[in-house]
């Protein structure tokens, strides 16, 4: 995809890499499918970096505007899927 991920320049380089991996996992959930544990593990790390619900919603909105993919919908779907199953939207 040719778009710029929403990033906060206050994040460290390591945190930015983690956030980009999370965005890529959301894309994968929409495009091919991703194992639930992989997605939820990246989401937990994302929440360590972005603990605020308001900030998470802001990032989700920005990400959805550039990619067309919803972080919220992907995570809700992952919570519905059994362990070791593929999350596909």
UniProtKB/Swiss-Prot annotation:
Coiled coil segments of this chain: none
InterPro entries (UniProt xref): BH2638-like_sf, UPF0223
Transmembrane segments: none
The family this protein is said to belong to: Belongs to the UPF0223 family.
HAMAP family: UPF0223
Protein's UniProt name: UPF0223 protein BCG9842_B1176
Organism: Bacillus cereus (strain G9842)
């Amino acid at each position: 995809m040719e778009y710029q991920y929403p990033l906060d320049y206050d994040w460290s380089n390591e945190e930015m890499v983690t956030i980009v991996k999370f965005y890529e996992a959301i894309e994968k959930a929409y495009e091919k499918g991703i194992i639930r544990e992989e997605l939820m593990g990246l989401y937990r790390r994302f929440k360590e970096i972005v603990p605020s619900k308001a900030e998470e919603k802001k990032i989700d909105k920005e990400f959805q505007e550039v990619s067309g993919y919803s972080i919220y919908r992907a995570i809700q779907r992952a919570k519905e899927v059994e362990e070791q199953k593929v999350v596909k939207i």
